[in-house]
Amino acid sequence: MALAGSNRSVDGVRNAEREWHDAHYGAHAAYQYPESLDDFLNIFEKGQISRFCDGGWSWWGYARREVIDAIGDVRGLRVLDYGCGYGNLGLYLSCNGAEVSGFDLSQPAIETARKAARRYGLAAEFLEMDAAALSYPDDFFDLVVGFGVLHHVIKYPGADAHLFRVLRSGGRAVFHETLWDNPLINFARRFTSEHSDAGDAHLTEQAIRRFCRRFPQVQLEKRHLFYMLKRLAKLPRMEWQAELEPRPLWQALSSLDQQILRLRPLRYLCGEVIVYLEK
């Protein structure tokens, strides 16, 4: 079956995506996690996650903090780390009292997540799985959380139905995603984004709402206008920023956005969004 809007087959795109991520995660797995759980929590909580995430700049940790703040207290909740990658978000939520499951298309990523869970004595379960063929029971999770994953899965037929199916009635899903509604930000992404042959989607508000159409409650909280200058940190000639940890700069830009984006029409220009869903 051909992928919508493409002459490539769904299986062909899926295999290309798996191969790209297997190579990516396999190359970085050796230095993914520190030895002790305390060290992992310290690194995660400070946002200095260069040892186990792409790029390694402090702004990445700051964005992850936004997800954690958005989902709130997870104690006693059954949580799905959706497209978990190395599993660091799921492990952090497990440390905070959640019953965590995670899945990813990449086998090397899942192996790294499992090893970390065993090392830290956490009960989080990680499985290699396709978002369009989830094996979890119906109405199983209280919360689904994902960071930068919808642009990977939105193109696969059935992924939206499976997301809706595994979330219980009254359950929530929270995703932090990129937006491609601002032409200037999109131009900068040509130079600062990693590109694969897997046909990653350029998410617009319309595309996100279409993917989430089954949910009775959908809220998009658009974020980051000036803060999108963080993209400059991914230019090769500016890798020195990884050593300087310019976290105060990213926080200042975020504070500026909080003031500027009170003008609601400007929110259309934002480069990222937090997606809130409720079933």
Tell me what each language-model feature is.
Residues 6, 188, 222-279:
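A C-terminal cap/extension of S-adenosyl-L-methionine-dependent methyltransferases
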Residues 2-73, 174-196:
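Conserved class I S-adenosyl-L-methionine
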Residues 80, 86-133:
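Class I SAM-dependent methyltransferase SAM/SAH-binding core
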Residues 132-143:
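A short acidic, Gly/Pro-enriched loop at the edge of an enzyme's catalytic core
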Residues 157-169:
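A short glycine-rich, Lys/Arg-flanked "PGG" loop and its adjoining helix->strand segment in the class I
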Residues 200-216, 220:
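Short alpha-helix
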Residues 143-155:
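A short SAM/SAH-binding and catalytic strip from SAM-dependent methyltransferases
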